[in-house]
Amino acid sequence: MRIAILGRPNVGKSSLFNRLCKRSLAIVNSQEGTTRDRLYGEIRAWDSIIHVIDTGGVDQESTDRFQKQIHQQALAAAEEASVLLLVVDIRCGITKQDEELAKRLLPLKKPLILVMNKADSQQDLQRIHEFYGLGISDMIATSASHDKHIDLLLERIRQIAQIPVPSVEEQDAVQEDELPSEEAAISLHAFADETLFENESLSQEEASFLEELVAQTATPAPVDRPLKVALIGHPNVGKSSIINALLKEERCITDNSPGTTRDNIDVAYTHNNKEYVFIDTAGLRKTKSIKNSVEWMSSSRTEKAISRTDICLLVIDATQQLSYQDKRILSMIARYKKPHVILVNKWDLMFGVRMEHYVQDLRKMDPYIGQARILCISAKQRRNLLQIFSAIDDVYTIATTKLSTSLVNKVLASAMQRHHPQVINGKRLRIYYAIHKTTTPFTFLLFINSNSLLTKPYELYLKNTLKAAFNLYRVPFDLEYKAKPARKSN
C-alpha cells in the first residue's frame, strides 16, 4: 500500500513524513518550497511495510518557477497512492489553497484523511470544527513536531489497510546460548590450528575450544533487498535527468539552475527482474558556495547517501574540466570504501572528441579514478543508458564476492615466495594466515608475527598482488593486520 502526503507549503508535511517513517529523510525548514520532488519512505509496523510519499507544497498562486513541476509531482503521487493524507495548518484555518487541494483529491474516490497538523495546544484543538467545510469526514489533529496523536493516525492507516494486529506469542522458555560475534571468531581463525605457528602449540583444551568457535562462524547470507545506487556529483551535471531518462518518466524535477534537487530522493526501479533503488542526491558544493541552512543540509545528506549506498555513480559534465568538487567527491567515495562507476554525462555536446582519448586523459587527472569503470552517456539523447545497469552489476558482483580462505592464502604464499620481505633487526615478516574478512567494505585480515616488520613498500606489493589476482582494480579494499600475541613467560 502507498500513502501520499499532500498539502500547501509549510504545513508540516515533511515533519509528518519523518515522524511516520521514524527517521529524518526529508529536510525540514521554515523556508517554503524546501521539498520539491517526490520523496519515498516506509512505515514498518504490524509485520508489514507501507510505502509513504512526501510531496512538495502545492501553491498555484506562487511565483516560484518550480511550482508547476511541484504541482505535477504532487498530482502524480496522488494518482500513484491508494491512501491520501491532506495536511493543513490547524492554526491558520481553511485557506484557498486547502480548498483547491480538497476539490482535486475528493473526486479521486480514494481513502482521504484530513491531517490538521500543528495542533500543539488545547487552544489549537478548539479550531477543529472550522475544517468541516472541506467536506472530508476522516479528520485527525496532530502535532508532528511534538509527536502528538501520531499513534492515532497510524492506527487509522492500519484500519484502512486492513492489517491485523499481530498476536503476542509466548516466548520459548529455552534460550539458546549466544554464539560469539563474527569479529571475535574471525580473530581466532589463525590460532585454531596448531600447525599455523611453527614450533609453537596450544594446549589440547585451547585448540578444541578455538576450533569450535571457528566452526560456528559462518559467512553471512547475502541480503535479499534492492541494490542501492547513489548518483553523486556537483550541481547541474544531470543526475536527475539521468534518473528520469532511465525510468522514462519525470520522477525528479530538473532545471538549468544548480541546486534544484535538495532532498535525497529514493526511486525504486526494476530492470531485467532485478530491483534497484536509485538515490538522487543534492549536488555537493564548495563550502563557501553554501548560502543557507537548506543547502547545508542537502550537502550533508549527500554524504550520508554515500555512506548508506551499495554503489556510487559519480556524474561529471563532459563539457567541463574535472573540478575541485569532483575530486573532493572521489576522495569521499574512497573514504567510505564504496565501489563506483563514473558517468560522463552530456556527451552529445562533445564534437570531434574521440571517446577513448577522453577516457585516457580523464584517468590521468586524479589517482582515485584509476581503473574505475567509465561510461560516456547522454541523458538528453538516452545514449548508452542501458550500459549503466551492466556496469553496476559487474562492479557490484566483484565487490560482494566472498573469496575462499584457501585461495587467499595460496595467492599470498606465492607472493612471498616471489619477493621475500626484508630483514629488520634480524627478523623477517611472516604471514601465518589470511582471510577475506568482509565484502562491505572489502577487507582482508592477515595474521602476522609483528606489525613492526611490515614496511609500507611491502604492504603496497601485497595489495597490488591481491588486486591483480582477484580483479579488484575497480573495488576499493583494505588490508588489516593482527599480530601474534606475545608468549607469556612462566
UniProtKB/Swiss-Prot annotation:
InterPro entries associated with the record: G_ENGA, GTP-bd, GTPase_Der, KH_dom-like, KH_dom-like_a/b, P-loop_NTPase, Small_GTP-bd
Keywords attached to this entry: GTP-binding, Nucleotide-binding, Repeat, Ribosome biogenesis
Binding site for GTP 2: 233-240, 280-284, 345-348
MF terms in GO: GTP binding; ribosome binding
Domain EngA-type G: 1-165, 227-400
NCBIfam families for the chain: GTPase_EngA, small_GTP
Family designation: Belongs to the TRAFAC class TrmE-Era-EngA-EngB-Septin-like GTPase superfamily. EngA (Der) GTPase family.
Name the UniProt record assigns to this protein: GTPase Der
The species this protein was found in: Chlamydia trachomatis serovar A (strain ATCC VR-571B / DSM 19440 / HAR-13)
